[in-house]
Amino acid sequence: KNISNKYIEKNNLRGLVDAKKYSLQYNSSDIITFLDDDIILMPTYLQNICLAFQNNFQIKGANGLILNKSKQNIFKKTLFNLTHIGLYKDDRGKTIKTIDKDKPIQVNTLSGGISSWRREIFNNTQFDNKNFFHFMEDVEFSIRFKKKYKAGAYLIPNAELLHYHIESNAENKKKQILMHVKECFMIFKKNRRFSILGLDLTLILLYYLIYSIYFSFKNKNIKYLFSFLIGMTRGINIKIK
């Protein structure tokens, strides 16, 4: 089949979330795919994504399988799982020891930069381009998506790709800590009635406190901890639109 590319330039878009929302008006397909610019798709990636949607109408949103995903040690994995519950539960990083390449696997959170969606889900689940989520945009959108489609998110194992994340430098790491902490509060404020009495917020903040202390000692720089405290202050004071 013929493939055509349309390049759209709009200079006043405020980040990836705004760009995604803006791009929807140009779509004419039943399946919409968003891709980061640091990935390489295997030759059959899009074909297998489309087949999965065709064969299982329960699939409303999907990710492919990242082949070069870095492995976490047991301590980091355990700490992550213990501190990411309730609103912040995220099973994208779970290890799949035995995998059936032809069987989609249900997950609770999708990565936005390697995601595919049925067009109709955007009729009632829109991207939030008012609150400027960035590092936790995936989690924020997945929470609202799950409210409409409880069992609609899947990993498609035979849709394979490589994802080359750029290693963060010190300044980016500090910004990540600050923004993650702030956006944890933002997610809580948007969805507090679905929270586990605030325990989920408390635990994920503990995770980032440990994270910031670790990098402060590792790099002998207290500014990582300061980033956590600034994120706390901004998160407490921020108002959700």
Task: Specify the residue positions occupied by each region the protein language model found.
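Short, flexible, basic/aromatic active-site loop/helix in glycosyltransferases
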Residues: 82-107
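Active-site donor/metal-binding and catalytic loop motifs
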Residues: 129-130, 154-173, 183-187
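Acidic donor-binding loop at a coil-to-helix junction in glycosyltransferase catalytic cores
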Residues: 110, 134-141
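Conserved donor NDP-sugar-binding/catalytic core segment of glycosyltransferases
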Residues: 44-78
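Non-catalytic, C-terminal membrane-associated alpha-helical segments of glycosyltransferases
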Residues: 174-184, 189, 194-241
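Short aromatic/hydrophobic "clamp" motif used to bind/position activated sugar donors
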Residues: 32
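Acidic donor-binding segment of Leloir-type glycosyltransferases
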Residues: 1-9
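Glycine-rich, basic loop-to-helix element that forms the pyrophosphate-binding segment
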Residues: 10-27
